[in-house]
């Protein structure tokens, strides 16, 4: 029994098609990637990148530029100056003038205490009372001197207090005063007291 012979043909797979490389004369540009510094590098460089945060009312109000009494903005620039609330500006002037008046009242009170102490000391040492020698004419002179001192104190207070600016307190509407008061209360209760207290978690 004869067996038929078969020719076995092997065909190698054709290589994949490769796109021709286009060689250009232009140099290849190198891109430099800056790496973000780690926690150790931050301490050496001394630069800390803070995370974005929401601005509170107190921190926003701290950046407000307040005009001085002489018309300057304090920054040396000629741009428009954003004025603060007229109520708080008037209140500040009133507090300053009250401090000046309080100093005068303190000095006057101390002088009166010194005079009274000298009178009592003289009466104890010499035994002579100054009040027994006073008659109607002396009482009238003492009352006149007291009224003169009161008039001088009133004149001094009148000159130190800015009458026009203090009068603005009564012209401020009730709604604006309540709004500013509520704003200060809410800001003090629910927001940070100092922007410097913020700490960045590295």
From Swiss-Prot:
Keywords of this entry: Chloroplast, Membrane, Photosynthesis, Photosystem II, Plastid, Thylakoid, Transit peptide, Transmembrane, Transmembrane helix
Topological type in the membrane: Multi-pass membrane protein
Keyword Transmembrane helix: yes
Gene Ontology annotations of biological process type: cellular response to high light intensity; cellular response to UV-A; photosynthesis, light harvesting; response to wounding
Induction: Present at low levels under low light conditions, but accumulates under high-intensity light. Induced by UV-A illumination. Fades out upon wounding.
Annotated Gene Ontology cellular component terms: chloroplast thylakoid membrane; photosystem II
Cellular localization per UniProt: Plastid, Chloroplast thylakoid membrane
Stored InterPro entries: SEP2 (IPR044971)
Sequence similarity: Belongs to the ELIP/psbS family.
Functional description taken from the UniProt entry: May be involved in non-photochemical quenching, a process that maintains the balance between dissipation and utilization of light energy to minimize generation of oxidizing molecules, thereby protecting the plant against photo-oxidative damage. May play a photoprotective role in the thylakoid membrane in response to light stress.
Protein name: Stress enhanced protein 2, chloroplastic
Species name: Arabidopsis thaliana
Gene: SEP2
